[in-house]
A protein has these predicted regions:
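Formylglycine-dependent sulfatase
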Residues: 1-277
Length: 277
């Protein structure tokens, strides 16, 4: 079931907060933007989260990938917010191969990769999308009971920095000439190539996860929800929509989304968002 008029928030953390709580971000004082590095704030601990509700209902709960809802105190971190396991990063972005943040070059610190409540160096050098995919497939394949489960896979691509294995970016370089204009024009062209490759890498990894669900016999009893937290930060990546990430034009908030996998979405039909005359 494709949701072709699905709206998120203009920035990462507000969208994640809404997904985790079912509340508008302004009700949690998180409407203004992303929770940046070293910020003494996070998703309010007095508000019950989706994984907490599911765990109360008997689900096992797992987070793979990006958290980005605060880590200034252990009470704000995933393991304290309803997840039984966490494998990923706490903050907004890091190098897709080294897990180091941009602050590393200024402060001599900034490594961001966690297994539950401890720093881990697993998967050193592995591209982030493949790293999160492997962990998700492992969780799917390791399920050996009738206990229902919830996995939030929060991929760090296609967020900057723009990095991807060459076999993906080469798809979009073929037959295209590198521009010879200004430094900004060349950079925008290169970033566009890389970002397209990053999305293709995501597509491949999501496909492998879906195959793992089918192979394990869990696909038809699993509700899969795909969403994005905001529009592209590059305006040309949102065409024909106006605007970009951080703006309330449709280019910043209207994002891809679909639901699949469960009997709930079989035999669906398309409805038009238009008005009848």
């Amino acid at each position: 079931m494709i949701l072709d008029q699905y709206y998120a928030q203009p920035k990462c953390s507000p969208s994640r907060a809404a997904l985790m709580t079912g509340l508008y971000p302004y009700k949690m004082s998180l409407q203004r933007g992303a929770i940046g590095d070293f910020r003494p704030m996070g998703l309010p601990t007095v508000i019950k989260t989706l994984p907490e509700m599911l765990r109360s209902a008997g689900y096992s709960t797992h987070l793979v990938g990006k958290w980005h809802l605060g880590y200034c105190h252990p009470d704000y971190t995933p393991i304290r917010r309803g997840f039984d396991t966490f494998y990923g990063m706490m903050s907004q972005q890091s190098d897709h191969y080294t897990r180091e943040q941009a602050v590393n070059k200024y402060m001599g610190s900034g490594y961001d990769h966690w297994r539950d409540g401890n720093v881990t160096y697993e998967g050193a050098g592995l591209y982030s999308t493949n790293l999160w995919e492997e962990e998700t497939v492992r969780l799917v394949n390791s399920r050996n009971s009738s206990t229902p489960w919830f996995i939030e896979l929060s991929l760090t691509a296609a967020h900057s920095p723009f990095q991807v294995p060459e076999r993906f970016s080469d798809i979009y370089r073929a037959g295209r000439s590198r521009p010879t204009g200004s430094k900004e024009e060349v950079s925008a062209w290169e970033n566009g190539i890389l970002r397209r490759g990053m999305v293709t890498a995501i597509d491949e990894s999501v496909g492998r996860i879906m195959e793992a669900l089918r192979a394990s016999g869990q696909h038809d009893n699993t509700l899969v929800v795909f969403s994005s937290d905001n529009g592209s930060g590059m305006k040309e990546g949102n065409k024909p929509l106006r605007g970009k990430k951080g703006e309330i034009f449709e280019g910043g908030v209207r994002v891809p989304a679909f639901v699949t996998g469960s009997p709930l979405v079989k035999n669906t039909k398309r409805t038009s968002p238009g008005f009848k005359r």
